[in-house]
A protein has these predicted regions:
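Active-site-proximal loop/turn and secondary-structure-junction residues that shape catalytic pockets
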Residues: 40-42, 65-67, 96-99, 137-141, ...
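Generic structural signal for hydrophobic
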Residues: 53, 83, 121, 125, ...
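Generic enzyme active-site microenvironment
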Residues: 60, 64, 173-174, 206-210, ...
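Structural motif corresponding to the early beta-alpha repeats
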Residues: 63-152, 264-281
């Protein structure tokens, strides 16, 4: 019986991984850096979130980019104190882009809001020692395009703050998102084209998300390899956008592709973000947290990821 095409692609990645394991075992010594995106925890305290991550052996956190105004959001010193008390470092910040701060908006006040928001988050990311700030080129939850110029408006608006990424030493990580949620930049290829259009050293990286990739990419593993050195963070959830191990996501092939890519190094992160299904996940950030459910979600996800990684790496 011949293999299906996706199986052939899986096998190519497996063969490359096994060759790496056999010929360059030193490249597998370091494990992947496991982080967690905390905005899906809803309206719980950062202290509670940090304790949960510590219990599950997660050493990094992707902080909710919640500086929606000058007086809103985390304060750096307080946040650092809480995280340090639980042995957690900041991997990066998850930028949140709605219709109110849409880089591609046809309304100038909304683009200005995006500029002001990015200025605040770039500074905060740097204060926290974060490596990257996630940037979405268009509003999440708006799958219908404004017009034919929205891509260029987004590029032009992000370009206004591009110098700040360089000045603060923060990577702008462009996230492709599935067509059910956004009107532009849905694939790794789209993200690379967007980066090329911005054409700035401060905007050179990609934040991929396997949940979106299963809808938009021909093969997740191949797309990760296509992202190459631009890939700085990978959001994870299973096929049902739940805990890892609860669906049919091919986690082994993803892990092998990341090792082939050399992703197991400083400044590169694997970040679970299981939010549940739906066309607009942002309401999760305002939800009332169920601590027991979240404890279980994090514990099972972290344990399953490390179990599969240990099995593959040996």
């Amino acid at each position: 019986m011949t293999k299906q095409r996706y199986e052939e692609k899986n096998e190519r990645i497996r063969s490359a991984f096994l060759a790496l394991k056999r010929e360059q075992p030193e490249r597998l010594r370091e494990r992947l850096n496991l982080s967690w995106s905390n905005w899906g925890f809803g309206m719980e305290s950062l202290e509670t979130s940090a304790k949960r991550l510590q219990r599950s052996g997660i050493g990094y956190i992707e902080l909710h980019g919640n500086h929606y105004g000058p007086d809103l959001g985390y304060r750096a010193k307080e946040t650092i104190d809480i995280l340090e008390a639980h042995g957690i470092k900041t991997s990066g910040v998850c930028g949140m882009f709605s219709a109110d701060n849409d880089l591609s908006s046809s309304r100038a006040p909304h683009r200005q809001a995006a500029i002001d928001y990015l200025k605040r988050e770039i500074e905060f990311t740097a204060e926290m020692g974060g490596s990257y700030l996630l940037v979405v080129p268009g509003a999440v939850g708006r799958p219908k395009a404004y017009d034919d110029m929205e891509f260029q408006r987004s590029v032009d608006t992000l370009s206004i703050v591009a110098d700040r990424f360089v000045a603060y030493g923060v990577k702008a990580a462009i996230e492709p998102i599935r067509a059910a949620e956004v009107s532009l930049v849905r694939t790794i290829a789209d993200a690379k084209a967007y980066i090329a259009a911005v054409d700035h050293p401060g905007v050179q990286h990609i934040n991929a998300d396997v949940y979106h990739m299963q809808a938009e990419e021909a093969h997740i593993g191949e797309a990760l390899l296509e992202a190459g050195e631009r890939l700085v963070n990978l959001h994870m959830a299973d096929s049902n956008r739940g805990a890892l191990g609860d669906g049919f996501m091919d986690l082994d092939t993803i892990i092998m592709a990341l090792y082939v890519l050399g992703f197991n190094r400083e400044g590169r992160f694997v970040t679970p973000e299981p939010l549940g299904p739906g066309g607009d996940p942002y309401p999760a950030m305002y939800g009332k947290p169920d601590a027991a459910k979240l404890d279980d979600l994090v514990a099972r996800t972290a344990a399953y990821f490390r179990e599969r990684e240990a099995f593959l790496v040996g």
